[in-house]
């Protein structure tokens, strides 16, 4: 399995890419199944992760991590609450009624509505990949502050400056120990394998411009 950021900017090569500071930036990438196996993989197509580097929480399972490097060193990301950047979630949170209907349909035994919500979120992130198939995604991001359309939680702050050269990379981590809990909604079968593990994309150099 591979994540690849394509050279789809016709006007300039990857080595000269400029990204606008505080402007919406479209980041596109492909997920490629190089194997001869059918796979199910958890990945969110609406936004990147809102949590700090290396963190994988059940609610954010399947949210790819947008990472920035300076001279080969991973830059820190900080979380905070900035009201003017909140409220960007692409789809509204389900109501309690919708969650209870989801619980009944999927025969879940949880009493805590938060647990049901986690399963509901995960169920919307499941995609399939046939052998040799490529799926493409395009997500918007803003720098240095980012609030993910996949969540309405804390805002991320990337420690980046204008007119300096950086690299960005997309990282996806699906820990094997987390997957078993969600097997009832992922629906593994003899045909489909459930992907677990880490995938990292190629690095793309950029300069942040105001």
PLM-predicted stretches and their roles:
Residues 1-22, 34-42, 206:
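Low-complexity, acidic Ser/Thr/Pro/Gly-rich terminal tails and inter-domain linkers that flank the onset
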Residues 16, 123-129, 155-158, 191-195:
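Beta-strand-rich interaction surfaces with strong enrichment in secreted/lumenal proteins
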Residues 21-28, 200:
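Short, solvent-exposed loop/turn segments enriched in Ser/Thr/Gly
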Residues 29-38, 53:
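Asparagine-centered strand-capping/turn motif at beta-strand->loop junctions
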Residues 43-134:
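The feature marks short-to-medium sequence segments in extracytoplasmic or secretory-pathway proteins
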Residues 128-141, 204:
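Short Pro-Gly-centered flexible turn/kink motifs
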Residues 145-180:
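Short, surface-exposed ligand- or partner-binding patches at beta-edge/loop junctions that are enriched
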Residues 172, 177-208:
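Short Trp-Ser/Thr-centered turn/loop motifs at beta-strand boundaries
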